[in-house]
């Protein structure tokens, strides 16, 4: 099949030769000079626009460096700004709806401090667990769950599949 297409393409090429660039006048030196001139003018215009935008932006930025009406101001590392003085009173917590924070007891903290005297004999305090009971109770498996959650787990316990 490929050789039929190749033969047909060769016959069409011999029968109808392709148009040459010379017949359209594209190799005329006057046309080349005209296109070169257009390209040169385009390059000059683009370069002028680029330089104008670059230099006008830097001059404009220097003039309006710290305008109070601007949404964003650039950082000025040469000038040091002072922070607001924090109030010594307890601040209102926005996460608690503006209410004052109450002082927490050390026992209410999320993390407890390590007690080094107990850490010296850490492995001696680890006890061995008894053997778990197997059966319907699952009490050892669901330690620390409420009775409602335990009932849900018991109801959803995997059931054996019927043989096929």
Curated annotation (Swiss-Prot):
Membrane topology reported for the UniProt record: Single-pass type I membrane protein
Region (Disordered), start-end ranges: 87-111, 124-143
Modified sites of kind Phosphoserine: 58
Residues modified to Phosphotyrosine: 72, 83, 111, 123, 142, 153
Side Cytoplasmic, residues: 52-164
Segments in the Extracellular topological domain: 22-30
Tissues in which the protein is found: CD3Z is expressed in normal lymphoid tissue and in peripheral blood mononuclear cells (PBMCs). Expressed also in retinal ganglion cells.
Biological function: Part of the TCR-CD3 complex present on T-lymphocyte cell surface that plays an essential role in adaptive immune response. When antigen presenting cells (APCs) activate T-cell receptor (TCR), TCR-mediated signals are transmitted across the cell membrane by the CD3 chains CD3D, CD3E, CD3G and CD3Z. All CD3 chains contain immunoreceptor tyrosine-based activation motifs (ITAMs) in their cytoplasmic domain. Upon TCR engagement, these motifs become phosphorylated by Src family protein tyrosine kinases LCK and FYN, resulting in the activation of downstream signaling pathways.
Domain free text: The ITAM domains mediate interaction with SHB.
Protein name: T-cell surface glycoprotein CD3 zeta chain
